[in-house]
Amino acid sequence: MFLPTTREEMKKLGWRELDVILVTGDAYVDHPSFGVALIGHYLVSHGFKVGIIAQPDWRTEKDITRLGRPRLFFGVTAGNVDSMVANYTASKKKRKTDDYTPGGSGGKRPDRATIVYTNLIKRFFPEVPVVLGGLEASLRRFAHYDWWSEKVRKSILIDSKVDLLVYGMGEKAVLEIAQILSRTGDIEKCKSVRGVVWWSSQKPEGGIELPSYDEISENPEKYAEALKLQTWYTDPYKNILIYQKQDTRYVVQNPPQLPLSQEELDRLYLLPFEREVHPFYAKMGRVKAIETVKFSITAVRGCFGSCSFCALTQHQTTHVSYRSKDSILEEVRILTKKKDFKGTITDVGGPTANLYGSSCSIRETKGQCQKFCLYPSVCKIVRPNHDEFISLLESIRKIPGVRNVFVSSGIRHDFVLAEKDPDVFIRELVKYTPGQLKLAPEHAHPKVLSLMRKPPVELFLEFKRRFETLAKKIGKRKYVIGYFIVGHPGEGWRENNYLRDFILKHLGYFPQQIQIFTPTPGTVSTAMYYSGLDPFTGEKVHVERSLKVRNKMKENVLFKKKGREKR
């Protein structure tokens, strides 16, 4: 079932008005990999009428008014990615293309889309509550360093002039907001909901106070301190309120929602998604973003890898939840009935596929302890369950109509190597790899890897050796390729040349999977970039801020110039 995007579609459903209208910076793709589709179907499954306005023209009222006034609220998201990341390259050049836009052309979503869409709504529907959500809002919920303007900005809640922001995976919080507004019509009563951020003119009682906006704007050390506190105390099982003074107001973060249970996840992903681009947008052109996920399966949520540069850990938390085998197999059966299904499940995973079935007795009862689960090595309390993941893949492959099952969404090779006999899993993984297994060592120099919270590169080489040896034994030509980041805090020319030499010596190919680090809001790495400090150790960190030098670092690793750079 597609959710309505026009009045005509509302009439076909017999709906005179909508309870909630969701506004997004992406094209409307009715697939569970797209947040608006998830939230929309979740609300509909609980009896609410929901419509979607995707990529509205922000220069006119034509799009934003086409569904009328919602009974309860507008929900606003920039889309699956931060709008500034969507619109600009790592060199701050305007992108000409956008995979989330029909036809692939850039310019269909504004910079700082959450703020722009909210202002548009307030212009034409000033009395209707607006609730922010999605990655852009979630990662900008407190004062944050904005690389594109090179300054610390206030919470997007303040900049948008709204009352409520949902952070993290928002199904439960959005449903509670809808239920409260339906009963009372009072947005103030929604400020008790877990997983929301709100503002107050009064200082909250209790909780953790972060350094203020003024403090972190003037003192980078305070910025690093604020990020550390936010990271440690944003945990559903610690149940702690966090707040930050911004001018005369306080931005208040309620404790996160508890992760969805397995039963809740199962029901969510089996809602009646069309798994297609909505016809209203499909007629405007191809939406490239659906092509890699259309026949994929989300099996896992959350990741306890805690990579410094990763926004997903900050957004989905370190708490891993996963779906039951029965639910996943039912979704596969649904996919096999699609007319354009050609027998291949392109991915079974999530942020990190092989965390499926894993557990930790401490995290599940007391919350994240003040240690990293996988850094500097895999914690002994964390329990992997690779057997269950392989059993799941085998069961999928036996379903009539399925010829291939692949794992494409990331494997933590250090987690595999922590097993007593890693080859048991690796041997099976070979069968579920489409020619090349993509891993993310990210760098080679020990200092940079330590700041990234990534394992030693020797573990990548060990996994690569085992994988390719086992593939060869069964007569398969399958290889491991690596993804790398340059320009991350801690990298200078010495570390960059170290990475170049590592690739030349150990990989034997010219890599194309090189990206320049982009300081996105809310991550540990961005705190390092702004402050020049490691938030968790207080140690000084070298930061390369020159765009010209960062581009040269990429060229150096891509072997576009002969010889090593000398600096």
Swiss-Prot record:
HAMAP family linked: UPF0313
Instruction: Give the note describing cofactor binding and stoichiometry.
Output: Binds 1 [4Fe-4S] cluster. The cluster is coordinated with 3 cysteines and an exchangeable S-adenosyl-L-methionine.
Keyword 4Fe-4S carried by entry? yes
Q: Tell me what organism the protein belongs to.
A: Thermotoga petrophila (strain ATCC BAA-488 / DSM 13995 / JCM 10881 / RKU-1)
Per its UniProt record, the required cofactor names are: [4Fe-4S] cluster
- UniProt-recorded name of the protein: UPF0313 protein Tpet_0582
Taken from the UniProt record, the cysteine pairs bridged by disulfide bonds within this chain are: none
Provide the binding site for [4Fe-4S] cluster. Answer: 303, 307, 310
Q: Which Pfam families match?
A: DUF3362, Radical_SAM, Radical_SAM_N
Membrane found in the keyword field: no
Keywords, alphabetical: 4Fe-4S, Iron, Iron-sulfur, Metal-binding, S-adenosyl-L-methionine
Please list the GO terms describing molecular function. Answer: 4 iron, 4 sulfur cluster binding; catalytic activity; iron ion binding
User: Span of the secretion signal?
Assistant: none
The record ties this protein, via Gene3D superfamilies, to: tm_1862 like domain
Residue ranges occupied by any Radical SAM core domain in the UniProt entry: 288-560
Q: Which NCBIfam families match?
A: SAM_YgiQ
UniProt cross-references to SUPFAM superfamilies, sorted A to Z: Radical SAM enzymes
List the InterPro entries hit by this protein, alphabetically: Elp3/MiaA/NifB-like_rSAM, rSAM, rSAM_horseshoe, UPF0313, UPF0313_C, UPF0313_N
Q: Which family does it belong to?
A: Belongs to the UPF0313 family.
